[in-house]
Design a protein with these regions (language model features):
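Non-catalytic linker/capping segments at the edges of enzyme domains
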Residues: 1-50
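HotDog/MaoC-like acyl-thioester-processing domains
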Residues: 1-11, 103-110, 114-150
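Short connector loops at helix/strand junctions that flank enzyme active sites
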Residues: 22, 34, 55, 66, ...
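A conserved, well-ordered hydrophobic junction motif at loop->secondary-structure transitions
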Residues: 38-65, 69-74
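Hydrophobic residues in beta-strands and at strand termini
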Residues: 41-43, 99, 145
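Hydrophobic alpha-helical segments of small multi-pass membrane proteins
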Residues: 61, 65, 95-98, 127-131, ...
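Hydrophobic beta-strand-centered segment that forms part of the acyl-chain substrate-binding groove
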Residues: 70-110
Length: 150
């Protein structure tokens, strides 16, 4: 089964979720039967924060890019396509991240995202990073309609 990223934006070069970026994280998110968008990510040794845990910047990227999957899926369902030849219909306008506990460097982590509110001008999503039955980090993501200027 192809991921949301592979279906909706397969040529995107984004570091976190772009499958066209060979050196990126290439996150693969899927919609569950309950409407929750999920993904599993296995960190690389290079993602070390210096203390043997997953780096906060990588966590932020994962939360941002996983929220993107939930937002782009919602936009697709509502027919809110990209405008003016843009690669995506929405762009990150805000990401309020909270780090709650260390996340492992050597084991897969789970990402969960839901759309909290959706209107064409902006969509908000709640996203969490889980490991060992506990939330390790969470974020509220604000996405704004991308309107390219000529």
């Amino acid at each position: 089964v192809s991921s949301i990223q592979e279906r909706l934006y397969p040529t995107l070069p984004c570091f976190g979720c772009g499958h066209a970026n060979e050196r990126g994280l290439r996150l693969r998110s899927h919609e569950g039967d309950d409407g929750v968008v999920t993904a599993t990510f296995t960190p690389w040794p290079e993602h070390d924060n210096g203390l043997g845990f997953l780096n906060g910047g990588i966590i932020g990227t994962l939360l941002d890019c996983h929220s993107a999957a939930a937002v782009m899926l919602e936009a697709d369902k509502r027919g809110w396509a990209a405008l003016g030849g843009a690669a995506l219909p929405y762009v990150t306008a805000g990401l309020d991240v909270r780090y709650l506990r260390p996340a492992p460097l050597t084991e897969p982590v789970e990402l969960r995202a839901t759309v909290a509110a959706a209107a064409e001008p902006e969509i908000t999503a709640a996203v969490e990073l889980w490991w060992d039955g506990k939330v390790r980090a969470r974020a509220d993501a604000l996405w704004k309609r991308w309107r390219p200027r000529a």
